[in-house]
Regions:
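N-terminal leader/targeting segments
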Residues: 1-67
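Short, intrinsically disordered low-complexity segments
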Residues: 6, 18, 33, 81-83, ...
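Acidic, low-complexity, intrinsically disordered interaction modules
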Residues: 56-117
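Short, low-order "capping/linker" segments at domain edges
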Residues: 118-125
Length: 126
């Protein structure tokens, strides 16, 4: 059973959020808005980590016409079997709903690796 990653999850989350806001975010935000977005994501992703043992390892976002697409990649701190996969998928849907204030439209929740601990959540907001 897989247990932990090498860096602390808080340090990893800080790095992921910084990378997203600096390089991968297509919003035109002032510094205050970026800080609010970072704080909101930090709080929601920390809850996901605490409740489901899912560490966010990457975030991508892109605008296509009037629609914003998000991809969040997670690493589970424990090996995920089928019942647990359903539980963490539910947690990710709750995260999406909280992050988008209920406006997000679910696209997929997918295992990315043959090893059962890397998952990707995809959703959009129109």
């Amino acid at each position: 059973m897989k247990t932990t990653t090498s860096k602390s999850s808080i340090q990893n989350l800080e790095e992921v959020l910084k990378r997203f806001l600096t390089n991968k975010n297509t919003f035109s935000l002032c510094n205050g808005e970026k800080e609010n977005l970072k704080a909101n994501l930090y709080e929601l992703l920390s809850k996901l980590y605490d409740n489901y043992q899912l560490a966010c390892i990457d975030i991508n976002q892109i605008w296509v016409y009037e629609t914003c697409y998000y991809t969040f990649t997670f690493e589970s701190l424990v090996t995920v079997d089928r019942p647990r996969e359903n539980i963490i998928a539910d947690g990710c849907i709750r995260f999406m709903q909280n992050f988008t204030d209920g406006d997000g439209i679910f696209i997929s929740f997918t295992k990315l690796d043959k090893n059962p601990w890397v998952y990707q959540l995809n959703f959009r907001i129109s």
